[in-house]
Amino acid sequence: MSGAESYRHITVLLNEAVDALAVREDGVYVDGTFGRGGHSRLILSRLGDAGRLIVFDKDPQAIAVAEELARSDKRVGVVHGGFASFQAALDGLGIGKVDGALFDLGISSPQIDDGSRGFSFRFDAPLDMRMDTTRGMSAAEWIAVASEQDLHEVIKNYGEERFSRQIARAIVAQRAESPIDTTRKLAQIVAQNVRTRERGQDPATRTFQAVRIFINRELEEVGAVLPQVMCRLKEGGRLAVIAFHSLEDRIVKQFVKKYSQHAPLPRWAAVREADLPELPLKIVGRALKPGEAEIAANPRARSAVLRVAERTAGPIPEQSQRKTSEWQ
């Protein structure tokens, strides 16, 4: 039995995230990160016969589960691909506006715990790290050709690793002797070049995170999908995003703030804030984190943050609509 099959996947902030969508029985909803379908199944339980749920995932294993669900529930539509193709995928399915969209960002427990996927330094496996194993460059292939500067920048920017330059230099030196094609080889190089260890954290944690984020274009896709969702939400529709680390949460937070709050007016301004045009989003509640009971049951939930925004009647700036074209 593989790690993906043996690990019991626990959906993070299950009720809180679906509650945030305020699901209507006849609504159209999107689960942008199907995983093993925890959020999707709860959404379906609240939809009536006329409702629809479109699910996205890159991972072929997740898509297999989603397609099995779709065979038994005609309300479900499945998209094998990243959520950055949000608008194009909806167009292909003949769907216009939607009532809500949910994104549970980052890597899933089945992906981490399946040693063969190459996401974790806990297993010695081929260094792959692709969420979609059917396309794109693997981590090993990229590490084999990336320049020392590119390695440094990825590890520094996506892993926030203080020793990124030393790690990059060591990778280049080692690959000149033999390929760095397994998780163990990469983890050993990192361990030899991280001078101080963070309490309770393996020295390879930040580097593995950085390479995974880069290989899967995780941050670019988050930045790309948010304006697309804003364009497709009906008035009153909800966007709910669960982030697990500061890089992706910062993107979500800044996006929602930009389109829900006017910049402060100077004291000498002749116009009042109340006279400014309505913005396209409004923040719903405060950022929500898992409670102690959920963290005790699922320690991986500890860093999760849920942010929710609602579409208003405010117009969407033209430049935001243009930004979505790259991913269509």
Swiss-Prot record:
Binding-site positions, S-adenosyl-L-methionine: 37-39, 57, 83, 104, 111
Top-rank taxon: Bacteria
Pfam family, one: Methyltransf_5
Database matches in InterPro entries: RsmH, SAM-dep_MeTrfase_MraW_recog, SAM-dependent_MTases_sf
An annotated GO BP: rRNA base methylation
Catalytic activity reported: cytidine(1402) in 16S rRNA + S-adenosyl-L-methionine = N(4)-methylcytidine(1402) in 16S rRNA + S-adenosyl-L-homocysteine + H(+)
Keyword Methyltransferase assigned: yes
Keywords: Cytoplasm, Methyltransferase, rRNA processing, S-adenosyl-L-methionine, Transferase
Location in the cell: Cytoplasm
Gene Ontology molecular function, alphabetical: rRNA (cytosine-N4-)-methyltransferase activity
EC number: 2.1.1.199
One Gene Ontology cellular component: cytoplasm
Family: Belongs to the methyltransferase superfamily. RsmH family.
Biological role stated in the UniProt entry: Specifically methylates the N4 position of cytidine in position 1402 (C1402) of 16S rRNA.
NCBIfam families tied to this protein: 16S rRNA (cytosine(1402)-N(4))-methyltransferase RsmH
Protein name: Ribosomal RNA small subunit methyltransferase H
